[in-house]
Amino acid sequence: MRVFIISPQLTMKNTFYADEFNKEMVKQLRDYGVELYEINNKSIARCKLQIAEDSIIIVYNEHELEYEIFGEVQELLKKAIEKNAQIWPVAIDKKARIPIGVISDKQSYDVWEQLRCRDLDEQYIGIIAKIFARKIIARVFPTCYCEESEIFLSHRRIDGEDITAKIYDKMLVQAKELTPFRDVVNVKVGDAAQEVIDERMENSDVFIFIHTARSAESDWILKELRFALLRQIPVLWVQIDNADVNILKIKPSDQPHLKYTTEDFFDEEKLIKIVDTMLQTAFELIMDRSNQILGYVDLLEDLFGDKQEVVDKEKMIYRISVERKGYHYPQRNIEQYYQMFGRTPTLMDAQKLNMELNDTTADSIAILTNRIVSQSIRNNVVFDGIQDFYYHWNQYMAETQKGIKTMEIVISGAFPDSDEIFKQSLTDALILFAKAIISNGYELTFGAHPTFQELFYEIAKEISPQNYKEKVNMYISEWFLSNDSEKEAEYVDKFNLFKVDKKENLNQSLYEMRRRMIQRKEVKALVCLGGKVKENKKEEGIREEIELAQKMNIPVFVVGSVGGCSSEVALEYKNIGWRGLNNASLELNQKFLDGIDYFSMAQDMIKHISSDE
């Protein structure tokens, strides 16, 4: 879908604020890869020829027009109307709310009203431009972002209710199209409260975690964070009054995205800006997570090959026709449609997909996303996780064999020092690698990283509820247990626990734990992600673990795109042709260096190490 932006200079007298608005809008659209054309008096004729039915035309209103050039703009707009393109007028000033000429019946985007409801003046017009850009992005990339996104406000009532109420009320004013959820408001009298909360969590596009001092004590908060992270629903972490991050059992990232004091939320001017910042950051998180879906396009194309055809590229709808197995006599192919979503899909999406396809001969229609853990059928459409969809089709078509029980893959990782939004990429990578490893029959082995423990435990329970303990091996040095029998009992209940005797100091204890974890014949690969970069390279745990693996000829795979130490190590090995790291192809190592399709990386790695067995 193309977006055509008519320069304010062509339709307005005073363009100062319109230029500021336009500049920020264009920046946002370019940042997210929207195909756009800026129309000026030199390009207007050429652009008119390129307008198609699915185009969007942005035009700025003026209440008094005397420019000759406007006649050419009117001709362009007439052409757009003939092509059934969408025309979106923008009113910078309240006097210009009604467009002039052939589009006088169109509803304008009212910038003045957006500023008014925030009690802001034109100096803040860039904020409104970002909001308008989100509307365009929702239309251009409908499976990645939805203008009517649902926002789940996760908070502890005892010390977070007043703050959350302020946020909720202001969202209703500043983002009328969004649907925030606050349990005390949105759960009706007589409803089964937890059922409603669970349903709204499942339908959410983003969680906003209001981290107050008492949040860490709540099992409900822990449940909500687990729910979001396992379904790869983005979590915007908002820390209040420097609440202690170290006592959280599950952290969405290494550090909070935003930090405020309680008093900030009772200052009206600050509150308006806080909510806009939250909404913009939430949007960035949603888009960052949604963009990861693009990697699965190539993965499924490689899987199905000529058995797949594109139905609608922009809406990511595909049709597959695969020979049916397991019967002696001829029979028709399996016919299936699927649509891929980066955002959280809804029942309305299923209804639209059914209506658009209108094919009663298909065996099934599926909506695929990385937001789903368990398959369900709604509106006669199968809602399934992309990883599970790939895994089952791969098993069916290739009849691949799972790894045997004595085969392990070690995951090594720690949060790098980078922007908090992108630190969530490490959590995403950990989840996807863990799912791929366990689903393919390997055991997942790791050193007792406190944040990763809960993630790996929950993933193992989801995939193998009957024998999850056998799927995850956790190594820990006695240095960290300190005769804590309660903590040890918790670990034994969740994992295959291996305790390693502590040595004279912390560094020696860590080395011994890593050596015992890695240097075993059962270990078939080491995967390194993130890690802190230190002045003394010898203190970087990832480098020590790689050296231990190399001494046993264990292949090492280093993920570069999550940043941190693994990024530096990957570049170093690239410069020497990946020598000594593994015997995989240059292409696969390059994919680990700069790719973001972590599930595909994990599958390719498993294929490689399986072929070497």
State the predicted function of each range.
Residues 5-8, 90, 153-156, 238, ...:
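Short hydrophobic segments within beta-strands
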Residues 2-28, 64, 91-170, 241-404, ...:
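C-terminal interaction surface of TIR/SEFIR-family domains
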Residues 9-10, 48-97, 198-246, 323-331, ...:
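Conserved beta-strand-loop-alpha-helix hinge of the TIR/SEFIR fold
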Residues 17-49, 64-69, 168-198, 213-221, ...:
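Conserved BB-loop
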Residues 105-107, 197-201, 248, 252-258, ...:
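Short, hinge-like loop/turn segments at secondary-structure boundaries
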Residues 27, 31-32, 45-48, 54-59, ...:
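Acidic/glycine-enriched connector segments
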Residues 14-19, 68-71, 100-101, 163-165, ...:
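A short acidic (Asp/Glu
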